[in-house]
């Protein structure tokens, strides 16, 4: 599903760009989306 793949990339990028643990809670690790 292309939309899911797009979201996966977005969430991964979100986690990479947020250093604060509290902010990271809003991002899901890539592996949980498979």
UniProtKB/Swiss-Prot annotation:
The keyword Calcium applies. Contains 7 disulfide bonds. It catalyses: a 1,2-diacyl-sn-glycero-3-phosphocholine + H2O = a 1-acyl-sn-glycero-3-phosphocholine + a fatty acid + H(+). The active site is at 18. Binds 1 Ca(2+) ion. Coiled coil: none annotated. Snake venom phospholipase A2 (PLA2) that strongly inhibits platelet aggregation and has a strong anticoagulant activity. PLA2 catalyzes the calcium-dependent hydrolysis of the 2-acyl groups in 3-sn-phosphoglycerides. GO terms for cellular component: extracellular region. Ca(2+) binds at residue 19. It is found in: Secreted. Belongs to the phospholipase A2 family. Group I subfamily. D49 sub-subfamily. One of its GO terms (biological process) is arachidonate secretion. One of its GO terms (molecular function) is metal ion binding. Disulfide bonds: none annotated. InterPro entries: PLipase_A2_dom_sf. Keywords: Blood coagulation cascade inhibiting toxin, Calcium, Disulfide bond, Hemostasis impairing toxin, Hydrolase, Lipid degradation, Lipid metabolism, Metal-binding, Platelet aggregation inhibiting toxin, Secreted, Toxin. The keyword Metal-binding applies. Its cofactor is Ca(2+). This is Phospholipase A2. Expressed by the venom gland. Its EC number is 3.1.1.4. SUPFAM superfamilies: Phospholipase A2, PLA2.
